[in-house]
UniProtKB/Swiss-Prot annotation:
Disulfide bonds: none annotated. Belongs to the PRP18 family. It comes from Schizosaccharomyces pombe (strain 972 / ATCC 24843). Residues 80-105 are annotated as: Disordered. This is Pre-mRNA-splicing factor 18.
Length: 343
């Protein structure tokens, strides 16, 4: 009878997969502890292997991302150099080394709608241009580059140097103070001031994130900051386009101008207060709800007295204003490193 019971127990353990311990009526505690320790070590080894595999995959993805980013930048550089060569072939009237008097000025479009001084082409010889390139610590001749392409590259570098000087001047002196009180009377002037301030702030935000090392972006917080910046930049570009096209009414534009002015003066409490008045207005419902009952109320008409009330109903404007709020948050967080604008 005992033999039959032991055989049944052994078969049951085989079916359950728990036949590590011998089928006995009794066993020592030390054997049980050894078996438990063995299972624990096996599970720990499996978890370590999974962790190492996950870490290896993340490292491979990061390397692929960096390689892709480097490849895209190289392709962009090649494309820009190819465009410059094509532009040189179409705009250069003759293969002369000296620039002709008819083309003494290089047409430079406004960069980011800021005033950029024109770059004049002096009658420099190729030897003088090579000397200038050496002073700028740039290669005097690229592979397969013609003399005309060298001259064009020099003036392109000169243009970028001028833009860099303007950027440095903006970083040290700051942009013009926004005259938000006359936003309705002198709207074109104030629009230019607001656009210049927003673009300058976006550049500072971008430089702040670019100055961080690659290792710092491994944390979830840094990745979230980068994601917020990309989305905010995209929506702020839409807001800038709305301002340039004068697609905003005077009340909304004046409120945005005042928000930017308060950021210039580092008055972030007033800037946030103005943001709340712009987004919510006189309405007590921040999500656009204006009716909570079936009966019309006298106070409901007063809720719509301010044209900016319930502005969050418009999805496009809501995203723009959300990006503006994130812009205010960044300015407030980095206010110690940003210059205060003076009249």
């Amino acid at each position: 009878m005992d033999f039959l019971k032991e055989e049944i127990e052994r078969k049951r353990r085989q079916l359950e997969g728990t036949s590590e311990l011998p089928v006995k009526k009794a066993f020592r505690r030390g054997d049980w502890e050894k078996e438990r320790e063995k299972k624990y070590l096996q599970e720990k080894q499996q978890k370590d292997e999974q962790r190492e595999l996950k870490k290896r995959k993340l490292e491979e993805e990061r390397l692929k991302y960096e390689e892709k980013k480097l490849r895209i930048s190289r392709l962009a550089n090649k494309e820009s150099s190819r465009n410059e060569e094509l532009l040189t072939e179409t705009t250069t009237p003759s293969p002369a080394v000296k620039a002709s008097p008819a083309s003494t000025k290089l047409s430079v479009s406004e960069n980011d709608r800021l005033s950029i001084p024109e770059i004049t082409k002096d009658n420099l010889t190729l030897t003088e241009i090579i000397a200038k390139l050496r002073e700028m610590k740039e290669p005097i001749r690229l592979f397969g580059e013609s003399e005309e392409a060298t001259i064009q590259r020099y003036y392109s570098l000169l243009k970028y140097k001028k833009l860099e000087e303007i950027e440095n001047e903006l970083l040290t002196k700051g942009v013009e103070t926004i005259d938000f009180e006359h936003a309705t009377t002198t709207k074109p002037k104030v629009s230019k001031q607001v656009v210049a301030f927003l673009q300058h702030g976006i550049r500072i935000w971008d430089n702040f994130l670019s100055s961080k090392s690659i290792n710092s972006f491994e944390s979830s917080e840094s990745q979230m900051q980068l994601k917020i910046f990309r989305q905010a930049k995209q929506d702020l570009d839409v807001l800038i386009q709305l301002i340039v096209d004068e697609a905003l009414n005077d009340d909304i534009f004046k409120s945005i101008a005042e928000i930017c002015y308060r950021c210039q003066k580092h008055e972030f409490v007033k800037a946030n207060d103005m943001y709340l008045r712009l987004t919510i207005g006189n309405a007590p419902w921040p999500i656009g709800v204006t009716m909570v009952g079936i009966h019309e109320r006298s106070a409901h008409q007063r809720l719509q007295a301010n044209p900016s009330s319930n502005i969050l109903k418009d999805e496009k404007k809501r995203k723009c204003l959300q990006a503006l709020k994130r812009f205010i948050t960044f300015q407030e967080r980095e206010s110690s490193n940003l210059p205060e604008y003076t009249d």
